[in-house]
A protein has these predicted regions:
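Hydrophobic, aromatic-rich transmembrane alpha-helices
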Residues: 132-135, 233-239, 301-324
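Transmembrane-helix motifs of polytopic, lipid-linked glycan transferases
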Residues: 118-143, 181, 185, 315
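Interfacial juxtamembrane loops and adjacent helix segments
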Residues: 43-95, 100-117
Length: 494
């Protein structure tokens, strides 16, 4: 394939994959609560993290107090310094919060659509870099098979989980970029080591160190990812009896961890906090983890639509009489990482394993590359059709929060009642899931208990408690339940 044709095809796939993401961005009308907490944390605010609202606010005043209250550059530098010392979110580093804070300098809109469009441009920049790197990563495997290379590029670019990751205002797109960069460096190093062409010099040491830093500084769960790739590297060096060279790569790991501490003083605070990982492992059995892994991730999230992929892989496996030794080792490493990360994750959600998406999907173009002629064309067409169908169902695009549109309307209905009271009984962070949807011109009174309500006329109350729960049993006759949304029950008090 000519270079000009390759470039045009690369550009076409990039434009299509970006277009799909722009479409789903246009459908995004609400936030996941973690996205709002990203704004609070990067701005080093207290409301919504350590303190709750108290007193009377208009919706606009409440939004301004929580979302981007300090848009100036000097304020941003102060917030970045505070986040460098302690970002208060000990299960994440300050990396993404620093980038997001700089991106928000001068931004003052409180409209949901404006915030989504502005903040997602960071992810689009990361995605373009990721896409370019993905091309070079796939070239390591299919440099002699350009059609298979571009098939892999298209399938990964249209992956529903990858799309969801791009339009999620959190650090996971940056994390995916870091994971792919490390995979590229490790695979390239393995190829060169097998050919005895790898140079153990300062340049490669620094590149490998940076690659490790770029992923572990994105999230503590990525230590598992680094460990799995590192174990293969160690195993291969042991096979070649180059034991002393293991020290070289161990040194890159230590240097990367040291660099993480330089970039974030609170990097080791997770070791002194109540650890979600160890706590989760001790509290759940193997069955408790394995069951959610299968039924939530594979079935509820509609991953059963990947059955055509599995059928093609099984067909090739049997027809070509393949063995496990012929499967790309990076795919096996990705499977091990995904199971381990999902097992130890505090929540059963795909965001913790989405960084392994390109490595997991690598098996599909690999299997198709074993076919010839008409069989290869049919298999390729079936896989592309599967990817298109997957991305067209909104249920497959995680974190879109379509259900919040109706629930948010509960906050703005019954305008004939001038008094709206919000009671916060639980954690301050629950207010992150209600403040962005307040009516700018309506007045809201925030209190901490039912006893603080002093209103003799009919009014509306929202309270963060379990679905359908009444704060005081004897009030059932006076409180009319109107619905549940954003961690809050909504009532009309007669």
């Amino acid at each position: 394939m000519k270079k000009t044709h390759s470039f045009l095809l690369f550009l076409a796939i990039l434009i299509v994959s970006l277009g799909v993401r722009f479409y789903w961005e246009s459908q995004k009308t609400a936030f996941h609560v973690d996205e709002v907490m990203s704004f609070v944390l990067c701005d080093y605010g207290d409301l919504g993290w350590t303190t709750t609202f108290s007193g009377e606010y208009t919706g606009a005043e409440a939004k301004q107090s929580m979302l981007f209250p300090h848009p100036g550059l000097d304020d941003a530098i102060q917030d970045i310094r505070h986040n460098w010392q302690d970002n208060r979110d000990h299960y994440h580093t300050n990396f993404y919060y620093t980038i997001l804070r700089l991106w928000l300098v001068g931004f003052q809109s409180y409209h949901i659509n404006d915030i989504i469009v502005h903040c997602l441009w960071i992810n689009y920049i990361f995605y373009v870099a990721y896409f370019i790197l993905l091309y070079f990563f796939l070239r390591l495997f299919f440099w002699e098979r350009p059609k298979i290379l571009f098939l892999g590029l298209l399938l990964i670019g249209l992956s529903a989980s990858d799309i969801a990751n791009t339009i999620f205002i959190r650090e996971y797109m940056l994390q995916e970029l870091g994971a792919l960069f490390l995979a590229y460096i490790v695979v390239k190093s393995v190829i060169e080591i097998k050919k005895d062409a790898y140079q153990y010099n300062i340049k490669n040491f620094l590149i490998t160190t940076f690659a490790i830093w770029a992923i572990i500084f994105n999230g503590y769960f990525q230590f598992v990812y680094v460990g799995v790739l590192g174990l293969y590297l160690v195993w291969m060096l042991c096979q070649k009896k180059d034991y002393y060279k293991i020290i070289y790569f161990a040194g890159t790991m230590l240097a990367a961890v040291a660099l993480c501490y330089v970039c974030y003083q609170g990097f080791f605070k997770i070791l002194t906090e109540d650890n979600k990982v160890s706590g989760g492992l001790s509290a759940r059995t193997l069955r408790g983890y394995f069951s959610p892994f299968l039924f939530y991730s594979l079935f509820v999230m509609h991953y059963t639509l990947y059955i055509p992929y599995l059928f093609i892989i099984a067909y090739v496996w049997r027809k070509k009489r393949m063995s496990i030794n012929q499967v790309p080792w990076i795919f096996i490493a990705a499977v091990i990482y995904s199971v381990a990360a999902f097992w130890t994750a505090p929540m059963r959600t795909n965001r913790y394993i989405v960084s392994a998406t390109p490595l997991l999907l690598l098996i599909v173009p690999f299997a198709i590359s074993k076919l010839q002629g008409k069989q290869q064309k049919i298999a390729s067409g079936l896989c592309i059709l599967t990817a298109v169908v997957m991305m067209c169902f909104k249920g497959n695009i995680e974190n879109m929060n379509f259900d919040k549109d109706e629930k948010a309307n509960l906050l703005n209905n019954h305008s004939e009642m001038p008094t709206y009271i919000v009671i916060n009984k639980k954690q301050p962070w629950t207010q992150c899931d209600i403040i962005p949807y307040l009516n700018d011109h309506r007045h809201y009174i925030f209190v901490n208990s039912v006893e603080e309500i002093k209103c003799n006329q009919p009014h509306i109350v929202s309270i963060d408690c379990f679905r359908g729960e009444y704060p005081v049993e004897k009030m059932k006759q006076q409180w009319e339940y109107k619905g549940y949304g954003s961690f809050y029950n909504h009532y009309i008090v007669k």
